[in-house]
Amino acid sequence: MHKRFVMVDGPDGSGKGIIVNALKKWAEQQQIKVFNLRDYCRENNRFPEPEEINDFDAIISSEMSYCWVGNALREEIVRKNNRNYSITSTAHAFSLDREILYNMVIIPALKQGKYVFQERGIISSIVYQPVQGNISLTEIMRLPGNKLALQNSPNLLIISQVAPETIMQRLSQRQKQNKAIFEEINFQRRVEQRYNSQWLKNLFESHGSKVVYLDTNFPKTVEETEKEAIKIWEDFLEKN
């Protein structure tokens, strides 16, 4: 199987969307036909059937998804609404959303040799959920969707790095506040430590991923981040 699965992960406000967009631009410059799964799910409130993506060579994806379980997560479960869903329920919801995404889109696309550029994934559950509540890493990794994702780990994992203080500043400047429960400074500091940990890197390397870090702290510009992301990807392609 071609090594064409790239996952971009990191704290909120760390530039993940910029990096994925850079990979999308790269694909378009290579005359690769791109299917934007996020836009499709927003517009149709469902995942595409396999035949609907046959004519495309690259998929732009993200977690949480933008339909079904993903919408329940975005609009209800992880919002600040004082309904306080348990960490177990939250973890199961993320796992189910992931299981559907992988079975319906990611795995079939990779088997067909398509590129997959995805924002967030199983690494987010591993980083965030033990910080959010009383749940062990072992329990998280045993959930079916999470097991499936680890069995189909990305070939290249780009972790975007930024200081927690910068994250809070960036999030406060966003036009659309998503009201997620994760946007607290102490929470972000703990998240940063986990993303930068050696054990996390070792975990994904043991599942076949190449792990690369991309610093997006000021004064790095959007253009510089995009350029560095493409260089990381092209260097990976050259060696694989």
Indicate where each model-derived feature is located.
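Pre-Walker A (Motif I) flank of P-loop NTPase domains
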Residues: 2-5
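Hydrophobic positions on the alpha1 helix immediately C-terminal to the Walker A/P-loop
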Residues: 19
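A glycine- and Lys/Arg-enriched "phosphate-lid" helix/loop adjacent to the NTP-binding pocket
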Residues: 124-194
